[in-house]
C-alpha cells in the first residue's frame, strides 16, 4: 500500500488472498492444467492454510489489513462459509467468496438440469447469507443469463 501511494496510486484497491485453504476442492482445476507436472511444489499444504483452522485465516486477514489491504477473498468458498461470516463480522470489510472448480464440478455432477439450477442458486445464496459482498464463480455465465 505504501509503495502504491508513494507512486501516486492512491485509488488502487488491494484484494487480499489472505484466506486460501489447502483444499481438495482445487483438484479438478489442477488436474485440467496438469499442475503437478508444471510445479516443483507437490504439496500446497506447505503454504496454504490448514483446512481445520479458521483462526489462522482471521490472523492472516488482520495482518493483510494492517499492510493496507482493502478487501479479502476466501478460497474455496462453500466449505468455508464460517470464515466468510467471521471475516465480514470481525473486520467489516468487503469480503469475497471464490467458488472453485471442485465446488463447480460437485454441483454439476447432480443429475437433471432443473436440479442443477436450483443447486447453483442455493450455493450462491449461501455465500450471500454468510456475508459475501461478491462471488467469483465458474457459474457466472449461467448466473448472468438467469438472474
Task: Set out the residue ranges of the language-model regions.
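Alpha/beta enzyme core
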Residues: 1-147
Amino acid at each position: 500500500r505504501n509503495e502504491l501511494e508513494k507512486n501516486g496510486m492512491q485509488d488502487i484497491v488491494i484484494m487480499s488472498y489472505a484466506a486460501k485453504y489447502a483444499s481438495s476442492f482445487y483438484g479438478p482445476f489442477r488436474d485440467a492444467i496438469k499442475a503437478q507436472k508444471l510445479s516443483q511444489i507437490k504439496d500446497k499444504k506447505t503454504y496454504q492454510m490448514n483446512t481445520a483452522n479458521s483462526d489462522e485465516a482471521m490472523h492472516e486477514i488482520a495482518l493483510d489489513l494492517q499492510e493496507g489491504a482493502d478487501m479479502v477473498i476466501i478460497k474455496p468458498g462453500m466449505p468455508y462459509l464460517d470464515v466468510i461470516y467471521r471475516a465480514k463480522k470481525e473486520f467489516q470489510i468487503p469480503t469475497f467468496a471464490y467458488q472453485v472448480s471442485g465446488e463447480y464440478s460437485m454441483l454439476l455432477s447432480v443429475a437433471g438440469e432443473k436440479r442443477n439450477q436450483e443447486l447453483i442458486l442455493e450455493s450462491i445464496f449461501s455465500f450471500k447469507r454468510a456475508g459475501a459482498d461478491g462471488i467469483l464463480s465458474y457459474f457466472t455465465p449461467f448466473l448472468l443469463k438467469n438472474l
